[in-house]
């Protein structure tokens, strides 16, 4: 099949709509269940490239959680700690595979943004991954294969209408790609830039101690950015993107947005948050929203008399601004990547507040000396990759 008819395009008024192969060849994917839409397939094909490249670059199973053609999260398949299992709502007795861990971590970083996500897996979807996904609100999934048990589990989602797409893992697109805007065709070479450890050798900071785990984190950050709407900045810890700032017009706003998301992720591990006692019948999305509000400056919205009883068994103590600041200050060893150069040292200053020790960015600003000096002030490791990663 070289074409797939869709219900509509980006919006219901945009008809007709389809995806097809210009050269008349067969589509490199098959729809195993459901009826994916235009934006679903944009998410699917962008997210597949991300996880495929992550797997190639790190040798680890990789997963992503996409919304509106940008990743809400991405991660490689490292084991979950007991705290991870608690904040990601994982059954302590569940048997987890590496690919399941990768998706749980990818989705867990920003659970509000991942509500109704598109999931992407570098490896075959197994029953462990499907079982976790079954209880989450999600629009669809793309993977190179599915076990029989996993497919049966996924087919029960959304009253049997959950979108399941299988991609040919060996498919390679043409070297040149096209896009029509206002009736005009744009042509460019596909972004086939390989991101690997060789890109991280130009360390321009005084501190040149870049351990292997930080190299993996830099690779995760850069590949995530390669498939994030620009401008974009990504914070990573232990192979997991913990904050993605996408589609901002200024670099510092990207750095702030991604940093705030990284802070929110870390605040969910605060002892007061871990001790929250939720009512027995609370839904996962309601629990996610409650945690998000509780850790924000709007905490009274869930703690007011007559309100907290809907969510908690016991009224929680306020997580004060001082407690939040002190907790975030304990975060260390974080990596930040940027899809274009940092024009000023203020980006480094903001990144430091979220525990950043390692920075990967292209370099090339007329103020590179100021950026380097700011990194040196805090003993950070700064690598200039020489590669811009804009994505539109």
Residue spans for each PLM region:
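Substrate-contacting helices/loops that form the catalytic groove of nucleic-acid
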Residues: 175-210, 268-280, 284-291, 301
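Active-site loops and adjacent core secondary-structure elements that bind or stabilize anionic groups
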Residues: 1-199, 214-232
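Active-site-proximal loop/turn and secondary-structure-junction residues that shape catalytic pockets
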Residues: 70, 125, 237-240, 342, ...
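Conserved helix-loop functional segments at active or binding sites
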Residues: 53, 227, 264-268, 353, ...
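A structural signal for short secondary-structure junctions
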Residues: 57-58, 111-114, 226-227, 328-331, ...
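Glycine- and Gly-Pro-enriched alpha-helical subdomains that act as flexible
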Residues: 72-111, 242-344
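C-terminal binding/interaction regions
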Residues: 117, 121-122, 135-165, 170-172, ...
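Flexible, glycine/charged-enriched surface loops at secondary-structure junctions
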Residues: 57-65, 164-167, 230-237, 267-278, ...
